[in-house]
UniProtKB/Swiss-Prot annotation:
One of its GO terms (biological process) is neuron development. The keyword Nucleotide-binding does not apply. Residues 253-263 have a biased composition (Basic and acidic residues). It comes from the Eukaryota. InterPro entries: Atat, GNAT_ATAT. It comes from Caenorhabditis briggsae. It is an enzyme of class 2 (transferase). This is Alpha-tubulin N-acetyltransferase 2. Specifically acetylates 'Lys-40' in alpha-tubulin/mec-12 on the lumenal side of microtubules. Promotes microtubule destabilization and accelerates microtubule dynamics; this activity may be independent of acetylation activity. Acetylates alpha-tubulin with a slow enzymatic rate, due to a catalytic site that is not optimized for acetyl transfer. Enters the microtubule through each end and diffuses quickly throughout the lumen of microtubules.
Length: 263
C-alpha cells in the first residue's frame, strides 16, 4: 500500500513506535501522512478481519482516555513515496479475567488491540518482526498479553512463533493463554458454593425422612381406621338376634326375667 509521502523525513525506524504524545506532535495539519497512514491501515485491518466498524483511527487514539501506542511497519520506495506494510496497536487495560479453574482476577495487562499485515506483505516475516519489536520495546512477554477478539490467523501466528496454545476465552471477548495466570493471585478464588449448599439440603431432607419413618413413637402407635373404612356397612354394629322362646336359651331367659321378651 503506497502513500505519496516520504515517511523517512519524520520516521526514524522502519517499525516506528508512536505514543499519544508523538501523534499529537505530528498533527494532521503539518504531517498529514501520519494520520493518513494510521487511518488507511486501520480501515484495511477492519475489512480484513470482517469487523463492522473501523477500530483504529488517528482521532480515536488521541481522544482515548487510556494511553495507546501504535507501531507502523513501512518502507521507503523510489521518489517521495513510502509503502505501508502493517500496523499494531497496543495499550494497558484493567481487565476482569477468569482462568480454567473459574478463579477470577482483576489485572492490568498489555492488550493487543489491533494487529494487521497487508496481505501482499504477509509470509515474509514482517508480522513476527513487528510483533517481536513491540514485545521488546514494551518489555513484556507474549504470555503476559491479552488479545482483543483474536482471529484464527492471530491464534495460528501465536502458536507458530511463540508456542501459545489453547487460549482462555473471556466473556469480554478478550483472550489470554494459561501461562498468563502463573504467579498471579485471584481476587475471587473459586469455591463450589452451589454444590455444597445443594449437598447440605439433600442431606437434611434425607435425614428428616429417615427419622420420620423410623420414629419409635410412630412405630408402636395403634392403627386408626379411616373415615371411609368406618362408613363401610360391614363395620356397623349388627342388630340383636331374636331368641326363640321355645329354645333352651328362651326358657332360661323367661325363667330368669319372669316375663316374655318384648323384642
Amino acid at each position: 500500500m503506497e502513500i505519496a509521502f516520504d515517511l523517512s523525513s519524520i520516521f526514524t525506524d522502519n517499525i516506528q513506535r508512536l505514543e499519544k504524545a508523538d501523534l499529537l506532535k505530528y498533527s494532521p495539519k503539518q504531517y498529514w501522512a501520519v494520520a493518513k497512514s494510521i487511518d488507511t491501515l486501520g480501515e484495511m485491518s477492519s475489512k480484513f478481519h470482517g469487523w463492522k466498524r473501523i477500530i483504529t483511527m488517528y482521532e480515536k487514539i488521541i481522544d482515548h482516555d487510556e494511553d495507546q501506542t501504535v507501531y507502523i511497519l513501512w518502507d521507503k520506495v523510489d521518489g517521495n513515496k513510502s509503502v505501508l506494510k502493517g500496523i499494531l496497536r497496543v495499550g494497558y487495560k484493567t481487565l476482569y479475567l477468569t482462568d480454567n479453574e473459574q478463579n477470577q482476577y482483576m489485572e492490568k495487562a498489555m492488550c493487543i488491540l489491533d494487529f494487521f499485515i497487508v496481505p501482499t506483505e504477509q509470509r515474509s516475516g514482517n508480522g513476527f518482526n513487528m510483533f517481536d519489536a513491540m514485545l521488546k520495546a514494551e518489555n513484556v512477554l507474549v504470555e503476559q498479553c491479552a488479545f482483543d477478539k483474536p482471529s484464527a490467523a492471530l491464534r495460528q501466528f501465536l502458536e507458530k512463533y511463540y508456542d501459545q496454545k489453547e487460549p482462555v476465552m473471556q466473556s469480554n471477548k478478550y483472550a489470554v493463554f494459561p501461562n498468563f495466570f502463573i504467579g498471579r493471585h485471584p481476587t475471587v478464588p473459586f469455591t463450589p458454593r452451589q454444590t455444597k449448599r445443594a449437598s447440605r439440603a439433600s442431606s437434611a431432607v434425607s435425614s428428616h425422612t429417615t427419622s420420620r419413618n423410623t420414629s419409635p413413637i410412630g412405630r408402636n402407635r395403634p392403627r386408626h381406621d379411616s373415615v371411609a373404612d368406618l362408613m363401610r356397612q360391614d363395620n356397623f354394629p349388627r342388630g340383636r338376634s331374636v331368641i326363640d322362646p321355645n329354645s333352651p336359651a328362651g326358657f332360661k331367659l323367661t325363667r330368669d326375667q319372669r316375663h316374655e321378651p318384648i323384642w
